[in-house]
Curated annotation (Swiss-Prot):
Upper lineage: Bacteria, Pseudomonadati, Pseudomonadota, Betaproteobacteria, Burkholderiales
Name the UniProt record assigns to this protein: Phosphoribosyl-ATP pyrophosphatase
Keyword Transmembrane helix listed: no
Stated family: Belongs to the PRA-PH family.
PANTHER family: HISTIDINE BIOSYNTHESIS BIFUNCTIONAL PROTEIN, HISTIDINE BIOSYNTHESIS BIFUNCTIONAL PROTEIN HISIE
Keywords per UniProt: Amino-acid biosynthesis, ATP-binding, Cytoplasm, Histidine biosynthesis, Hydrolase, Nucleotide-binding
Gene Ontology molecular functions: ATP binding; phosphoribosyl-ATP diphosphatase activity
GO biological process, one term: L-histidine biosynthetic process
Compartment(s) of residence: Cytoplasm
Involved pathway(s): Amino-acid biosynthesis; L-histidine biosynthesis; L-histidine from 5-phospho-alpha-D-ribose 1-diphosphate: step 2/9
GO cellular component: cytoplasm
Gene that produces this protein: hisE
Pfam families in alphabetical order: PRA-PH
EC number, UniProt record: 3.6.1.31
Zinc listed as a keyword: no
Amino acid sequence: MTTPTAGDDILSRIADTLATRRPEAGGDPQSSYVAKLLSKAPDAFLKKIGEEATELVMAAKDGQPDRIISETADLWFHCLVALTHYNLRPEDVLAELARREGLSGLEEKARRPRD
C-alpha cells in the first residue's frame, strides 16, 4: 500500500482545504459551513457524524446504492472535519488501516491495549 500525497489524493486535498477553515487559520463561520462547525464545541460536528451514520445505515438497510454512496461521502466528510479539529489527517487513519491490513479481525482486536 502506498502512502497518498497531498498532491494526488482527494482525502488529503479535502483535509488541506478544511485546515484553512479552522478559526485560527482565519476561517469565517459566517461564510463557511466547516468554519461554523469548527468554531463551535465538538458536539456540533459529532452530532453531524451521528446523523450521517444513521442516514448511511438507513440507506444500506433500504439497499439503495446511490444513497449509500452519498451518505458515505457525507459521513466521511464530517469525519474529516473531526480529524481537522483534533489536528489529525486522513493519512493517520490510512496508516492505521495499513497497519491492520492482513490481520484477522479477532487478532487485531486482541492486540489492542486494554482500557
